[in-house]
Amino acid sequence: MKNRLVDYFISLVKIDSESKNELAMAERMRDDLMKMGAQVIFDDAHARTKGNIGNLIARFPGKVEKKPLLFCAHLDTVKPGKGIKPVIKNGKIFSDGTTILGTDDKSGIAEIVEAIRRLQEEHFDYAPIEVLLTISEEIGLLGAKNLDYSLLNAKVGYALDSHRIGSATIQAPSLNVIEIKVIGKEAHSGACPERGINAIELAAEAISKLKLGRIDKETTANIGKINGGVANNIIPNIVSLSGEVRSHSEEKLEKVTNEIIRTFEETAQKYQINLDGKVYKAKVDIKVDRDFPAMKIDSNEQIVQIALKAAKNINIEPKVEISGGGSDANIFYSKGIKVPILGTGMRDVHTLDENISIEDLENGTRWIMEIIKEYSKM
Ligand SMILES: [Zn+2]
């Protein structure tokens, strides 16, 4: 049986597009979207992200007077994503087991494109639509962070980049990455231990005082990496650690981050020695990077309600969700663009078992069509 949607999805996953190498995929999408009547432009984000093509922005003129509706997805995939050979088994599409499938996020792209194609074939009078396909989402939301926002006119829309069809993610936490360097003083551990300041000991004491893991319903903290020491007979003078704090509340994010900084600084003050009339003090260098800001869209917002109503219209159970991770949508939110993240049917993403059912591809497409119809009729 010939199925345009399935054939299209399969043709897209066969195009290699690991992060920073999205050129072939971007050119394919430019050609396809232009054939459908869109104006397509690229920004120059790749000049800053060191990729081989920028973000793609496509504009479909509307057939009714309305503000444009945005649909976003990302062009890149995680590794191993080269030479993907899709296989259909029992109504589901898998890779051959040696690579990921790339349904994250090509299911989103295929569903957006097929939905618009079908609406055009139905001669439906839709609102103006903008399609934004970003680069290098998987390696730190680089495309979204470096996007030329002057090229976007839409202020609301959807990112197709989640799992279950019918679910709309409307909240996601902010994330701080914390890098800590503890500096002690080196000395021979057998001959003159009193001349050293043990950075490992200091780090261990500070960590033992931290509250890690789940802090509360909205907040988590983790020390994820630690590195230090040279040899058993040397008192170590440097330990590097890194960790993160996530929270749905900016206030709590700041509070927990500051707590970690304060604990290291206070612990370091206890570590000092007096040598030959000179005082040696331990030091801590701490760097905090805001990786992404929180997203908090109210479930009563029209853009959320449209997605839920559209799901109901096609007999799919609607659901709002809160995520523990960040995505392009966090960055858009900080720029004043509200995009709930919708499920596309992708499963077991970022693994060799990644898959999607043909039924979900179809339902995802129908959901997007219904959303555009609801929005356009409003
Ligand atoms: Zn994704």
Segments from the language model and where they lie:
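Metal-dependent amide/peptide-bond hydrolase catalytic core
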Residues: 199-378
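N-terminal capping segment at the start of a domain
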Residues: 1-23, 290, 349-351
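Active-site metal-coordination/substrate-binding segment of hydrolases
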Residues: 26, 51-52, 59, 65-128, ...
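A non-catalytic alpha/beta surface segment that caps or lines the substrate-entry region
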Residues: 18-65
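Acidic/histidine-rich catalytic neighborhood of metal-dependent amide-processing enzymes
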Residues: 99-173, 215, 232-233, 241-244, ...
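Acidic, glycine-rich active-site loops and adjacent beta-strand->loop/helix elements
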Residues: 46, 75-77, 132-140, 162-164, ...
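Acidic-glycine-rich active-site phosphate/pyrophosphate-binding loop
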Residues: 78-91, 169-181, 309, 340
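Glycine/charged-rich beta-loop-alpha catalytic/anionic-binding loops adjacent to active sites
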Residues: 88-100, 183-187, 314, 346-349
